[in-house]
Design a protein with these regions (language model features):
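N-terminal leader/linker segments that precede catalytic domains of diphosphate-processing enzymes
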Residues: 1-57, 62-116, 126, 146, ...
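Short, solvent-exposed recognition segments
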Residues: 119-122
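Amphipathic alpha-helical blocks and their helix-capping loop/short-beta junctions
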Residues: 124, 129-148
Length: 180
């Protein structure tokens, strides 16, 4: 079964207004999906970054005025972090924007990636990359809860990684839309 068949019609149109609530800084991440293998590319951030060190994330980052719009932000950051050139990326639409704990209003943009693209990791920002199988993510037994700093968090357990926080919320939004 092709879980990606109806994805495009279940996404939001991309908001290019560059508006942010509460003066949060704007940011965009790319949710890169490999269509044939039905996998999502994720990164593990390096420990030397100023925010979210060592966490699992999508390629992306802060909006820069020279970007012009958030699609360009996501494309620029994806190329900087994992070396995927814009010609290999087909942006489909957006998921719901989210407020992050680091005071960013983050727009997750969903894109299909050419299967044969070669990753070129930026070691300053990305410690490693891995792929999450969409069909595995859809299994209820991979969406778990656990305690961290005396708080309960939901997370996905994938390839020996715990995917929690903003990345978990983005994946949950995506997976909910895939089930429609």
């Amino acid at each position: 079964m092709d879980v990606l068949a109806n994805l495009g019609k279940n996404l939001e149109s991309i908001d290019l207004s560059l508006e942010s609530p509460l003066n949060f800084r704007l940011a965009a991440v790319l949710v890169p999906i490999y269509v044939k293998s039905q996998k999502i590319l994720l990164t593990k951030r390096t420990e030397n970054l100023s925010h979210h060190q060592g966490q699992i994330s999508f390629p992306g980052g802060r909006f820069d005025e020279s970007d012009g719009n958030l699609v360009e932000t996501a494309l620029r950051e994806t190329e900087e972090e994992v070396g995927i050139k814009r010609e290999s990326i087909h942006v489909l639409g957006s998921l719901n924007p989210l407020l992050s704990t680091s005071m960013h209003y983050v727009y997750p943009l969903v894109a299909f990636i050419n299967e044969d693209v070669e990753l070129k990791i930026n070691p300053e920002e990305v410690q490693e990359t891995f792929f999450a199988d969409i069909k595995q993510l859809l299994l209820p037994e991979n969406n778990l809860s656990g305690m961290f700093n005396d708080q309960e968090y939901m997370y996905y357990s994938v390839v020996n990684y715990k995917i929690w926080g903003l990345t978990h919320l983005i994946l949950t939004d995506l997976l909910t839309r895939l089930k429609k």
